[in-house]
Each structure stands twice: as structure tokens, then as C-alpha cells.
Amino acid sequence: MPPASTSTTNDMITEEPTSPHQIPRLTRRLTGFLPQEIKSIDTMIPLKSRALWNKHQVKKFNKAEDFQDRFIDHVETTLARSLYNCDDMAAYEAASMSIRDNLVIDWNKTQQKFTTRDPKRVYYLSLEFLMGRALDNALINMKIEDPEDPAASKGKPREMIKGALDDLGFKLEDVLDQEPDAGLGNGGLGRLAACFVDSMATEGIPAWGYGLRYEYGIFAQKIIDGYQVETPDYWLNSGNPWEIERNEVQIPVTFYGYVDRPEGGKTTLSASQWIGGERVLAVAYDFPVPGFKTSNVNNLRLWQARPTTEFDFAKFNNGDYKNSVAQQQRAESITAVLYPNDNFAQGKELRLKQQYFWCAASLHDILRRFKKSKRPWTEFPDQVAIQLNDTHPTLAIVELQRVLVDLEKLDWHEAWDIVTKTFAYTNHTVMQEALEKWPVGLFGHLLPRHLEIIYDINWFFLQDVAKKFPKDVDLLSRISIIEENSPERQIRMAFLAIVGSHKVNGVAELHSELIKTTIFKDFVKFYGPSKFVNVTNGITPRRWLKQANPSLAKLISETLNDPTEEYLLDMAKLTQLGKYVEDKEFLKKWNQVKLNNKIRLVDLIKKENDGVDIINREYLDDTLFDMQVKRIHEYKRQQLNVFGIIYRYLAMKNMLKNGASIEEVAKKYPRKVSIFGGKSAPGYYMAKLIIKLINCVADIVNNDESIEHLLKVVFVADYNVSKAEIIIPASDLSEHISTAGTEASGTSNMKFVMNGGLIIGTVDGANVEITREIGEDNVFLFGNLSENVEELRYNHQYHPQDLPSSLDSVLSYIESGQFSPENPNEFKPLVDSIKYHGDYYLVSDDFESYLATHELVDQEFHNQRSEWLKKSVLSVANVGFFSSDRCIEEYSDTIWNVEPVT
């Protein structure tokens, strides 16, 4: 099938009607209509046609009966099924399509409203959008009001749909379980982006998200013999009823080739022609994002890569069957998976290709929308704010400069002024080694014109630096976008993002201060501190309280006498919960909510474990549920957690060996379940070794009958948003124990606190602000401070000291092969990293403090339960600052300069 037209013409009429009773033939449009265009078309449409169109206009359903009509219609016509073969999956698809119909009606109105009012828009570029399940989110967020009974329907669409499905013979819970998590992200970066698009829709910010439509997600994680095994995530196998395929929106994207200068163009600063060697098409898929209690529906546009020519008939007819589809395979690999393994050259090139493909398609879509308004280019920054979520979309800076200079023929400096006023960059790391870099050779091969532009950007930038600091010669090499010191010259993408943006923000107060004094201190010296701001991360309470923990949301609503749950829009209302910390009846209900959530989690773990109950259900209320669920990485220190578990297990065994009764052991080490979840990058050997160790420890501990269920260890495979919604509400304690000064913010800590779980953590990332907001008495802090880290690392390197005896005994036990009898040296790299290779993440320095803090946790949870419950309530009461609505308000005011459109 030939590709659809990629024309972005503004011409509306392609053929005049031959009769006054006919509607003129109109072109398919890629964007909304301006008011003058609507008026022009309106005059050409016959009155009879307009009247019929209005009469049969699709309307939103607002009653259970109307939903049932729409549902059955989709079952029988869209899905071609019937009453007799409509299973839960078909019910999910039909329900999703019915809900989507409502959202699309509001989506069209929202987009037309934005086009008509022409406000400044926000474009949020993120390589990840970890959206979770869409149906339940839509049921909570969507606005339904029955005009005949607005009070009864207001704020209760989920209850209405639940009842409607019950009448049709389906359980809402079973229907919701049919939806796979969208494979569009991995960790906190993608979940932050998802929370932000939710809040932007809720706040009425005119915004679109731009990402990629990964066919196989990042990967599905299986645990086989304790090892992580990556398999494709076939999340699209049954289709995706939420997306709208836009075959008419196809943007050609070029790679490789060479640069030509037209006559008169003598330098790289003049308009040049990039003659590409390979071209693919970016095809748009739209995903409606509903706001909460509003008819605003924003858009998430995802790009899929397709070839310009899918099939080479000449090669096929000549018997070259393999190469006849080679172009298709090369193109489709671009959006096959998130983060291709870059441990080898082809994977590295594919990653860069993926990033440019996404940036180019997104930027050209943004430019098309702007050009429609016919404003001068100087007004572009007044109409467009582009937020770079990490360094992955930094190529958009270079692409905009290329388009303005090469295609729009603007002067270089005029174009650069527009670029730097348009972009803002969010940094997500304080670790120098985590900053993204690309080899110059690879970059020039794939994107030759962009390399020229980067050289020019750097040249002008370094000129300005030299003028300001003529005597500081070393500053030029430290601050240069091009790194010269490595074996191969590298492009430092974070530096490019800073130079090309008008604002740079960190994501927690500590993080924002650290980047100004460490990795970006030279830029602060040049630009001054005002360019660098802080916007502490947040999470959407609609997803992480209402959807994840409906029983807690209901208790809060009843306690605050807030039947329409307005507190989900104004989280400051939660502070009223503080009045109930001495109310025994309320605390009893609060504890029951937690117990019910534990039962829900135990059911999930049983299901994941082939129907075997790992956790003893008899003592759930007296069992501390201790969670660490996040990406597996050495700096997040899952190894510290598992070493602590081993220490606890060995101490219990020693007590029994020395004649203590199980009751005496239980008094010293009360009941506890340690739960892990998270994925390692496929090529990250040490992280995968940590996963293996956790599972080996679980095998030994969980099958040791001598400790009688006092300690259990669980690794939940393939951790995702849906599993997080079950795990997080069940937590008593969660672990946020990164080495101080390494975690930018973290958002899982906020999710646990919002669900009444206490946290144990280092003084790092958003833990600092959580402690400030909810009170130091309600957080278990331990470990060294960030200002001590470099000195400790230096001492490890040049003045090594003996390990604490507690940690030494743990490492010796691991070295003995007790957890890996078939391969006693299995965990040698992990042990050696601490014993002999500098212990970069300071496990040995924090271990004893960590153990002592866990003793406090045991004491409070088991011996002072009423105090524990009070801390839990106060945590939720004071968590309001961490709503992503507050984040979006701060971005809007301090970075984007945009206002809500209501």
C-alpha cells in the first residue's frame, strides 16, 4: 500500500460542488481549524446538510443505559461478536471503545478550543511514558453528568460503569484485568511523564506529550533459575483500543547522507542541503489523556517507524527474498524496543537513530501547527514551550536550528535566539558517569548536518566563555560540548541541552543544589544561578491514591465529609486528617484498610507463584511488609537491603543454634516480609547479579522451616504500574536507600507515603523534602550525608579500613557458596566490589547505621502499633506538596510562562 500523503497544505477546498445541494469536497486536515477557516467552510455547506449533521451528531453517553447501548453496539459491530461469545477480553475492548468515544468527543472540543484561542502551548518530550492501564484511569478521571440528575452522576462514572457491566453479566475487576500495561516506559522517568500529562490535562494546560510507540516495550522480565531473562513484551498483541492511528500524519525522517552547499553558501552557518542516504516515515498514533473532573482531554502523540517502501518487487522477483523486505525491517527496528542494548556498535547506532527519529518527527509536527497561525518566526517562543525530559530529546534543539537555517532561511543568530528561548531542560541525575554522550564519529555518520551545527553552537558558546573568562583556559575544555579527553571525541548531550535552553531544572531541592555545585558548576559560573531552578517532582493522586487504594480514598472521603473527593484536586485538605490521630475508631479503620491491601498483595504473590502461598496469612496484621520496588541499580542499593536480610537471617539462625526458643527469636526479630521488584538493564551485569542474589536468598530463607515464617523474601517479576498499584498500598515500610547524593528525586517514595507507608531512607533526593513536609519523627533516616561521600570514596581508595564485622560476616557467608552451592563464586564480583574495588556506593559505610535503624523500625511497628498508625496518618495528611498538580503549576509559572485554558 503506498504511503499516505504527507502534505500539510492549508488549502481546504479541493473540488467545487457541482450542485448547490452537495457538500464541497474537503482535504483531510492534520490539525484544527482557525475561526476564519470555519467561517469560510460554513458558508459553502448547504443548510439541509448542516441540519442533518447537527441532528445526527454523536453525543456522549451520560447514563448507564446509554453506555450499555454503546457497549453492545461495539461488541456486535466493531468486534463482530455477540451475546454468545463475548468474553472478558471482548468486554474490555467494547468498554474501552465506549469510554474512548466519550473521550474523543471531548478531545475534539479541547483541541478546537486550543486552536481557536491560540494560546502558548507546551510540548513535553519524553522517551518514556509509563501510563499504566488506561480504562480504570479513564473511569476515574472522565467527566459524566446526567442532565436529568446531575447530582447523582457527578463524580461517579466508575460506579455507574461498574453497575452497567454487572447488569450485562461482567465484573468490572475482571474486565480491568484484561488490559496489559502499555509498554512505553521503564522506571521513574516514564511514570513522572505520565503523572505530568495527567496533571496538565486536569489543570487545563494546553499541552501535548510526544513519545515513541514501542512494539515490544522495554522487555517482559521472567525469572528463570533466579536470573532475569528478557523476553519481548507483546503488549500490542490484541491491539490497543485507546489509540487512534493517524495514517494521514506521516513525517519523513532522514539519516546518513552528506551535506551540500548551494552556490554562495561558503560556511556551515549558511543554509545547507542535507542529502540523506536513508529515509523512513514517522506515523502518528494519538492517545487521549483525560483530566480529572473536567472535559479537557489532552493528547499523547506516539510515533511508529515505517519504511517509505515496504516491499521491493524487483528483488523479490529476482529471488532475493531476504533483501526484498530489508528496508521494512531496518525501519521497524527503530521503534521495536525502548533502550536497545548499547553495549555494541549496532545497538548504540540504533539508540541514536531512535532519538533523532522521535525528535525530528515531533518537532516537525510542532512547527506545522505553529506555521498554520501565520505568525512571524520571532513569535515562536511566545507560542511554543518545549520541555526536554532528560537528555534523550536534546537533538530537538539541533533539529530546530537546522530547520530554521536550512529550510526557513533564517539568519544563524536569529534562529539560535529563537531556539534558546523555546527549550527548557529537566536534569535527572547528579552522577557524571550517567550523563549521556555520543561518539563524534557515529554522530557524523548518522547525522552529518547536525554535527556541523553542534560544532558551530559550541564554537560560538566557547567564544562567549573566553570573552567572559579570558584567563581561565581550562574552563573552555571543561565546559565544551565536545569532550576531547576520551579515546574518542564525544558530544556531551547534557551540556548541549544547557546551552540550548533558557532554563535548567533539577527535580528535588538537594538535587538542584548538587548539580549547581558539582556537574554543572562551570555553567553556573558562566550563566549565573538564575538559569538553574528547582521543581520538586510529584505524583498524581488520582492514580496513586484513588485508583491504587480505593478503600483508603473512601475512608478519607468519609472522614473529611468530602463525597465528591475534591481533596484529589486540593491536597491541602488532607491536613484535616491530623485531627483524627487520637481517634481509636478511626485508627482501627485505617489499620483495616492496610490489612485488606496486604491480603490483596498476598493474593497477587500467590498467583505469581503458581498458586503457592509464600506468606503466612494467619499473622498478616503482625507482619511488617517491607518494600523496595524500583529499577535495579547499584546506586539504588538493593544490595544493601539484601545484605541486611542475610544478616537478619544469620542472626536468627545463630540464636536458635545457641538454644534460644522460636518465641525468643521472634521477640528479637519479629515477623517481616521483604518484597523486591524492578528490572535491570539487559546489559548491566552487576544489577542482574543482585537480582540473582535476591532470588537465591529467597530460596534458602523461604524454605527454612526452623524460622517458622518469621522472615520471607519475595521478588515480584515484571514489575509494572499495575503491580505497583497493588504492592504500594500494602506497604508498612518502603526502602529509599540510595547512596547520598546519587538519587535526583525519586517518586516511589512519594507514592508509598501517599498510601500511608513509612519510609526508611538516606538523606537523598526527595527524601529530604518528604522529611520536611511530614516531620522527621515520621521518617526513618540513616547513613552518611552527601557532603561526606567524596571523602569516604577517597579513603576507600587510598586509606582502606576493615569492614564492619556485621557486613564482613554477611560477605563471608555469601563467599562460602551457601546461596549458590552449584557455583560458589557466583557472587564474587558483587563481594569484591565492596571488599577490594573501593565500595563506590558506600555499602560498608552505611551498613551498621542501616541495621540500627531497622531495629528501631521493628521496635515501633511491633511494640508501639498505635504510634506507628499515627505516623502513617500524619504522613498522608502532609503529603499534599507532592501532588504533580503543584509541579505543573510551578513549571507553568517559572519555566513555560503558560496559563490554563478553561
Curated annotation (Swiss-Prot):
Region entry Disordered: which residue ranges? 1-21
The record's GO CC annotations read:
cytoplasm; cytosol
Keyword terms, alphabetized? Carbohydrate metabolism, Cytoplasm, Glycogen metabolism, Glycosyltransferase, Phosphoprotein, Pyridoxal phosphate, Transferase
Give the Gene Ontology MF terms in alphabetical order: glycogen phosphorylase activity; pyridoxal phosphate binding
- Under Enzyme Commission nomenclature, its number is 2.4.1.1
Supply the Pfam families for this chain: Phosphorylase
Q: Does this UniProt record's set of keywords contain Oxidoreductase?
A: no
User: Subcellular localization, per the record?
Assistant: Cytoplasm, Cytosol
Reactions catalysed, semicolon-separated, are: [(1->4)-alpha-D-glucosyl](n) + phosphate = [(1->4)-alpha-D-glucosyl](n-1) + alpha-D-glucose 1-phosphate
Q: Which InterPro entries match?
A: Glycg_phsphrylas, Glyco_trans_35, Pyridoxal_P_attach_site
- SUPFAM superfamilies per record: UDP-Glycosyltransferase/glycogen phosphorylase
Q: How is its activity regulated?
A: Activated by phosphorylation of Thr-31.
Chain positions with Phosphothreonine modification: T31
Question: So which cofactors does this thing need?
Answer: pyridoxal 5'-phosphate
Assembly and interaction partners: Homodimer.
Protein family: Belongs to the glycogen phosphorylase family.
Q: Which PANTHER family match?
A: GLYCOGEN PHOSPHORYLASE, GLYCOGEN PHOSPHORYLASE, LIVER FORM
Name used for this protein in its record: Glycogen phosphorylase
